[in-house]
Structure formats: C-alpha cells, structure tokens
C-alpha cells in the first residue's frame, strides 16, 4: 500500500503522534517511554513558550490506515536571527524500518521548510539544542539518560538514505566513581587555589529561590555557550518553564554555582537519571504511577552531567576544576556510581584527550544531520503570529547589540527584518570539563 503523509490537525492525530513511539520500539529494550502528559504539553503551541518565536508542523506517515512514522518541521526565528542563519529544523522523528515512509516524511518536512525560505534542513532537534537532540549512531545497547534520545540503529540508514549528511558528531563520555583517584590529583590543586587566588567560591543552588537561581545559571550559560553550534539564548518565558520543570527532579547537591563577588562565573548541573524511574511508569503517573516513581527514585544510581560552563574571562582560572571536584565529592556522598558527561564535539581533539586522561571513555555518539535546500530569501508566513514576528526581530536586535557595531553589527541589525537576512556563520560545540582542552581549565560542556 502507498504511503500518505498528512499534517496533524485533529485531537486524535495528536494522540497518534504522541503514542507512535510505543508502536515503534520493542518493549523491554533500551528505549524509555516519556510521560505522555509532558509530551502533549511540549507539542502544545499555546502552552510551550518556544512558539512565541517559532512555528512548526507535525506530520504523520500512514500506510493502509496505520501510522508508521512521524516528524516535526519547525523554524526557530529567534535562532536564525541570533545566528544569522536560515535553518529549518526537524525533530521528533520516529519511523518503522520503512525507507519509503521515512523518505516521504522527510520530503514533506523539507517542502514545508522550503516554503518558509529556509536554505538548510538541520536536525534532529526536539525543538532545539536545549532539549533532546541528535541522532544516536553509536551506543545502541545502553539506555538513554534523562533528556537524551534513543534511536534504533536503522534510523541512521533512513536519514542518510534520504540524502542527509553529517553536520556535527558529538561524544558522550562515561565516568565511574572509581576513576576519582585518577582524576583528582590532576585537578585538585587548581581547585584548592580557586578561592585564595581568584576569589571564586562554589556553592549549591538554593531550591527555595529556584527561579532566581535559574536566572543566575542562565547568565553563565549564555556567556559560555554563546558561540556554540546551534545555540540561541532562552527567553524569559522559557527560563520560567525550565525552572518549573526542574523543580521536581533537581537535586541541589548536583546543581552548582561558582561566584566571584556575588556574581555567577561558572555553573555545573547534574541530573539524577530519572529515566530509571520513567522506565517503570510506561508514560503515566496516574493512577498508581506516582507510587512506583517514589519507590524507584530512591534507587537511582546514575547521573547525567548536563552542563558545565565558565564565563570566558575566567576560563583559565581553574573554575571548571573546582566544579568538577565538587561533583566527584557529591558522588562520593551519594548512591551514584556512574555518570555520563557531554556532549563533546568529535573533532575537539584537546578536549577528548583530556577526558581520556581522567579515565573517561566514549560510550555513545550522536549526530546532527543537514541537507541543503533551494536558495530563496528567508521569510515569515503572512499568517505568522505577531508575537513570532516580534521575537524574530528582538533576536536580531539582541544579536546586533552583542556585535557592538561595525560590519557585524550592521549585518545583525539588518536581520531585524525577518524578511531580509543573510547566510550565517557556524559555531563550535565545546564540551565537557574545559573548552580549551586542558583538564580543569574552563570552557563549557554542551547541553543536550
């Protein structure tokens, strides 16, 4: 039977879109079911603040009356204005081992993005690098950690068979608590000099004022990641949502702020691997899922180091060393015996050598793909919400301000009109302990 691709319109289509992964992935395998309620909230254009500066289409592939694949096509106007790009993004990709269906889905996504003037199709991202992103291309036997995607091995063939090529590949590093003796002699001296020589103190986040703490985190996050591949800063509304979402899962022992004179200069965020809990819930907290969750959370023995970053002016002061040492001390006081950190750009040789030097090993690779589209001027649809247009213009204005004038500033200012535009520049996805490649000396982790 032929494949038909249709956009999601009715409420039952949303249910099909959300529930499709349960049909794709074998029970008992590495895939971890997400919470259905949270998936619906993420996709809801009225409730997700991402859509104040973005637009999206959700697509389902049907064969003989049965859904066999899904994908989103979305344009983040704030990202494009911030980076000076014309990217069209794709994500939430799930498909049976059916090349015809995958081709039809990606072709429909490409057509939708092309209609909006995008010159490049980039992904997968659900919806951005601030959430689950990247296609798993190595490490299929391992379960994904919190906020990390998992894909069957045949997805790579489906995507590459459509004509997608690698944009960047990232590494996920595993470290065990037993590596501590090997690690600490290398960086503990840097950490000990941090306060007396640089006036930097490290503390744990205060859950009682989580909103303010998240804003402090965001200031470092934006400074440390500003030029990383695929990055654009979060809006105030998005920060509020992240603060709300983090509250039930945040363990303050794993959330660190480095401060100098009361100002944040470094951050580290590790999340207990709540996928160990979600695996038991099958997507539902009710009626009794919350009881299973309470029991399971006490047995979590892994953590994901989601972010570790330092402001540029202190990247050589040992701030990252201090954060990393404190994370290991936290692990020693907890049940955690294993951590995964990253992602690290595969071509970042200095950083990868540093990770090897502290006893870590690569356990997963994720890849972002791209495909060039027809050359047309970028544009917003005539029916785009006014808020989307304002967000696109504001993103460009912010970028112009940061550029500080000159040719780059003028170019950024021109982007304030989302109908005009220019080809963008790339970036580098820095990662893990230190972006300059020396253990404990700074830089930033990626965030996935």
Predicted segments with their positions:
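Conserved N-terminal entry element of GNAT/NAT acetyltransferase domains
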Residues: 1-14, 18-23, 186-209, 382, ...
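A conserved beta-strand-loop-helix scaffold within acyl/acetyltransferase catalytic domains
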Residues: 21-63, 73-81, 204, 209-309
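Acyl-donor binding region in acyl/amide transferases
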Residues: 80-163, 281-358
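Acyltransferase donor/substrate-recognition loop-hinge adjacent to the catalytic core
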Residues: 149-230
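C-terminal "cap" of GNAT-fold acetyltransferases
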Residues: 173-190, 366-390, 441
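Periodic, rod-like helical contexts
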Residues: 394, 405, 409-413, 419, ...
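Short linear/disordered segments characteristic of secreted peptide precursors
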Residues: 395, 426-428, 438-440
């Amino acid at each position: 039977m032929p494949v038909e691709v249709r956009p999601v319109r009715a409420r039952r289509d949303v249910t099909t879109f959300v529930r499709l992964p349960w049909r794709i992935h074998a029970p008992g395998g590495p895939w971890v079911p997400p919470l259905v309620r949270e998936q619906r909230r993420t996709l809801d254009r009225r409730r997700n603040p991402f859509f104040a500066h973005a637009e999206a289409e959700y697509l389902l592939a049907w064969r003989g009356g049965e859904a066999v694949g899904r994908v989103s096509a979305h344009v983040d106007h704030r990202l494009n204005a911030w980076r000076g790009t014309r990217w069209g993004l794709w994500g939430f990709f799930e498909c049976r081992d059916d090349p015809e269906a995958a081709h039809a889905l990606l072709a429909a996504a490409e057509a939708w993005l092309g209609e909006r003037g995008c010159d490049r199709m980039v992904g997968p991202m659900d919806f951005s690098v601030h959430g689950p992103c990247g296609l798993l291309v190595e490490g299929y036997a391992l379960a994904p950690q919190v906020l990390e995607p998992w894909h069957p091995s045949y997805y790579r063939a489906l995507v590459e068979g459509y004509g997608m090529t690698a944009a960047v590949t990232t590494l996920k590093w595993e470290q065990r608590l037993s590596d501590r003796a090997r690690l600490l002699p290398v960086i503990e001296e840097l950490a000990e000099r941090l306060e007396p020589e640089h006036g930097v103190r490290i503390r744990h986040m205060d859950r009682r004022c989580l909103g303010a703490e998240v804003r402090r985190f965001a200031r470092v996050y934006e400074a440390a990641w500003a030029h990383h591949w695929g990055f654009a800063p979060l809006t105030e509304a998005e920060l509020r949502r992240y603060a709300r979402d983090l509250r039930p899962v945040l363990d303050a022992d794993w959330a660190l702020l480095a401060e100098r004179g009361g100002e944040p200069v470094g951050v580290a965020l590790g999340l207990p691997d709540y996928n160990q809990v979600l695996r038991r819930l099958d997507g539902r907290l009710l009626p009794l899922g919350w009881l299973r969750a309470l029991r399971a959370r006490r047995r979590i023995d892994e953590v994901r180091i989601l972010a570790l970053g330092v402001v540029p002016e202190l990247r050589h002061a040992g701030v990252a060393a201090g954060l990393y040492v404190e994370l290991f001390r936290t692990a020693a006081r907890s049940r955690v015996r294993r951590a995964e950190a990253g992602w690290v750009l595969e071509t970042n040789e200095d950083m990868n050598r540093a990770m090897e030097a502290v006893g870590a090993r690569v356990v997963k690779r994720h890849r972002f793909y791209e495909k060039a589209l027809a050359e047309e001027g970028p544009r917003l649809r005539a029916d785009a919400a006014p808020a989307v247009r304002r967000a696109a213009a504001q993103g460009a204005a912010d970028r112009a301000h940061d550029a500080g004038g000159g040719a780059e500033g003028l170019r950024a200012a021109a982007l304030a009109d989302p109908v005009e535009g220019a080809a963008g520049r790339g970036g580098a996805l820095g990662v893990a302990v230190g972006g300059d490649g020396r253990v404990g000396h700074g830089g930033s982790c990626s965030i996935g």
